[in-house]
Amino acid sequence: FQTPPDLCQLPQARGPCKAALLRYFYNSTSNACEPFTYGGCQGNNBNFETTEMCLRICEPPQQTDKS
């Protein structure tokens, strides 16, 4: 079992700028990618343009039953 990368554990971070960009962050509490408004600068690396990219990087791999 692999855990998501450290960047997926970061909180959402709007940043100090005033843009209103729709982005997605990985919520490690709910294990889901959730939308937030990004200001356009600074912030952190838990910031994805699409839910698909967020899930590809951060979603834990599904357990496969090998029985």
From Swiss-Prot:
Q: Where in the cell is it found?
A: Secreted
Mind telling me which InterPro entries this protein's record contains?
Kunitz_BPTI, Kunitz_BPTI_sf, Prtase_inh_Kunz-CS, TFPI/VKTCI-like
Disulphide bonds annotated for this chain are 8-58, 17-41, 33-54
Q: Which GO terms describe its cellular component?
A: extracellular space
Annotated glycosylation sites: 27
| Keywords linked to the UniProt accession | Disulfide bond, Glycoprotein, Protease inhibitor, Secreted, Serine protease inhibitor
Report the main location listed first in the record.
secreted
Q: Which domain of life is it from?
A: Eukaryota
Residues at site: Reactive bond for trypsin? 18-19
GO MF entries? serine-type endopeptidase inhibitor activity
Report any Pfam family annotated for this entry. Answer: Kunitz_BPTI
Decide whether keyword Translocase is in the record: no
Looking up Gene3D superfamilies in the UniProt record yields:
Pancreatic trypsin inhibitor Kunitz domain
Q: What is this protein called?
A: Colostrum trypsin inhibitor
Organism, as annotated: Bos taurus
